[in-house]
Design a protein with these regions (language model features):
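Conserved phosphate-binding elements of NTP-dependent enzyme cores
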Residues: 1-158
Length: 158
């Protein structure tokens, strides 16, 4: 949501285990990374075409809907895997990120950027949205508020 996941992927790639394995932030992308589930292409579900009926969507049996491989899930930033981050709500992510101390300058910068990206969601009452929530599951009102959050100078009425 609003670019926050980009910074989280960078934080995951800064861990000692990810550096040891020469992983980039792209590894933690469910859109194109090699860490995504190959069976469902990072969707978390498989589409079954039912000819005369509506298509059926089943949870991917390989990743169980997490979108990532077990190997990608094993990398952790302060005890949270990429899947754990995607399950957090915007409010939970803000709270988690504020509690981390003793970081490098680069980590502090990335955490600051992540909080800055999530802050409009919390301020507009969208703090309950999960970081990995598909956009097609949002209501019309949620989608509209999310769009307003992307405007750089927009201030919500109080």
């Amino acid at each position: 949501l609003l670019g926050a996941f980009e910074h989280i992927r960078q934080l995951l790639s800064l861990t000692s285990s990810a550096k040891r394995d020469h992983l980039t932030p792209g590894y933690f992308s469910f859109n194109s990374g090699s860490g995504r589930c190959q069976r469902c292409s990072g969707n978390g579900f498989e589409k079954v075409e039912m000819q005369f009926l509506s298509d059926l969507y089943l949870t991917c049996p390989e990743c169980n809907g997490t979108r990532f491989t077990k190997a990608a899930e094993s990398y952790r930033y302060h005890q949270k895997s990429v899947v754990d981050f995607l399950r957090l709500t915007a409010s939970e992510a803000m709270e988690f990120l504020e509690g981390i101390e003793g970081l490098t300058n680069k980590e502090n910068l990335l955490l600051s950027k992540t909080r800055k990206a999530l802050q409009p969601l919390v301020e507009t009452g969208l703090g309950y949205l999960r970081l990995g929530q598909p956009l097609n599951t949002l209501s019309g009102g949620e989608a509209q508020r999310l769009k307003l959050c992307r405007l750089p100078n927009y201030r919500f009425p109080e």
